[in-house]
């Protein structure tokens, strides 16, 4: 195998997570906040960057800031016209409705969720399961109750995996 650098500072600073979509684009979370979150109610300084190969040569030649103002985005999953992403204290669906590569709509799917005790123990590893649900990890040392639109809920404390519907309807 061969290892190649595809993105680095200053374009991508302190990457936390990455994911590929069906078009081969690379989505990368970048943080300045970690490990100290921005205070609630204040805009975070973290981003999700979108890297694209626009000329088909196998190298990323376009970098777009898909979403900014985020707060330690440790989990992402490309979905439809955007990303399902964790940004303290919620799981969001960030959408690009006009096709310019930038999120212009933000819909809260789940939250607020716990993060106060330790930013190492938040929502991450967003993976679509064979069952069609989004599977996530919930790290250690935080207590989190996830409530869904249908009234279902779970409470977790330290080290869990769980699943949610991508539309916020069920957990």
Listing of model-derived features with the role each one plays in the protein:
Residues 1-171:
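Beta-propeller domains with acidic blade repeats across secreted/periplasmic ectodomains
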